[in-house]
Regions:
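Short, low-complexity N-terminal intrinsically disordered segments enriched in polar/charged residues
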Residues: 2-3, 9-14, 19-48
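Exposed beta-sheet edge and beta->alpha loop/turn motif
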Residues: 91-142
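Generic hydrophobic alpha-helical segments
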Residues: 14-15, 59, 76, 133
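Short solvent-exposed beta->alpha transition segments
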Residues: 34-36, 50-103
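Structural motif
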Residues: 44, 78, 129-131
Length: 142
């Protein structure tokens, strides 16, 4: 498939491809999705990549094995060092992503400063599951 960085980008489900149809603003939904994204990012920030995979949405898990995820995200995140700060820059509630099942999803874009690189853009896309739980379905870092 190419480099591991491309693989992690692919995992994002093309969430920012501009093909997602907006549903409109629903702050309570976005807040719940944002809390799920933050809890998941806490796992990844702590180097608990396998636990991040365990906590991810089924669609995420169907695209990559736990070991593949661990290797791919390790190769992208470790060189950046520890997360120093993360600021939410945008959020968008959508009902579909290219190639994915119907949503809803919330596409969250953060500006993140790491020890070795500032101004990194992270996109985290939680999906609302059939069990009424928000779980991360996509992660893209550039």
């Amino acid at each position: 498939m190419g480099t591991r960085r491309e693989f992690v980008a692919w995992l994002s489900g093309l969430s920012l491809a501009g093909l997602a149809r907006p549903l409109g603003a629903d702050q309570a939904v976005e807040d719940k999705a944002g809390a799920a994204a933050q809890a998941w990012l806490d796992l990844v920030d702590g180097g608990r990549y396998g636990a991040g995979w365990d906590a991810a949405a089924p669609a995420f898990k169907s695209m990559v094995t736990r070991d593949e995820w661990d290797q791919a995200v390790h190769s992208v995140r470790e060189p950046l060092g520890r997360c120093l700060s993360r600021t939410l820059r945008s959020h968008k509630l959508v009902d579909a992503l290219p190639g994915g099942p119907r949503g809803p999803y919330v596409v969250l874009q953060f500006e993140t400063d790491f020890e070795q690189k500032a101004g990194v853009v992270e996109t985290v896309t939680p999906a609302f599951g059939s069990d009424d739980v928000w779980r991360v379905a996509g992660y893209f870092i550039r």
